[in-house]
Design a protein with these regions (language model features):
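HhH-family (HhH-GPD) DNA N-glycosylase catalytic core used in base-excision repair
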Residues: 1-117
Length: 117
C-alpha cells in the first residue's frame, strides 16, 4: 500500500511567514516605489498612489521612483481628491517622460483614473 504524501503544515507555514515579515518589515522599503503609498494616511490616496506607481513600474527602480514622485508632486497632498476633482497641476507634468510614457499620454490617463473615483 502506497503512502500518501503529507500535506503542508499550514499553521507552521503561517508562523514562519509572520516571523519573516517581522524580520524584514521596512527594510529596503525606502528605495522601493512601494514606499510611496505609505506616505499617505487616507486609504483612497494610498490606493491611487499604489495604482499610479504600479502603472509606471517598468524600468529601473530608481527611474520608476523618480517618475512616480514627479507625478505625485503634480497631484499635491491628496492625489485621490485632486484626480476626482480634476484639480491637479497639469503644467507641472510638462516635459514628463518615463520610458515611452510622456505627458501627452499621461494626462488623459490621469483624467480617466479621476473619472473612476
Amino acid at each position: 500500500m502506497k503512502r500518501r504524501p503529507r500535506g503542508p503544515d499550514i499553521p507552521l507555514l503561517g508562523e514562519r511567514l509572520r516571523l519573516l515579515e517581522e524580520e524584514w518589515r521596512g527594510r529596503r522599503l525606502d528605495s522601493d516605489p512601494l514606499e510611496l503609498p505609505h506616505r499617505y494616511a487616507a486609504p483612497a490616496d494610498r490606493e491611487v498612489v499604489a495604482f499610479l506607481s504600479a502603472s509606471l513600474a517598468f524600468g529601473r527602480v530608481a527611474s520608476i521612483r523618480s517618475s512616480a514622485e514627479r507625478l505625485l508632486d503634480a497631484l499635491g497632498p491628496s492625489p485621490a481628491d485632486a484626480l476626482a476633482r480634476d484639480a491637479w497641476d497639469a503644467p507641472r507634468l510638462d516635459g514628463f517622460v518615463h520610458r515611452w510614457v510622456d505627458s501627452r499620454s499621461l494626462r488623459p490617463f490621469l483624467r480617466a483614473v479621476g473619472a473612476t473615483l
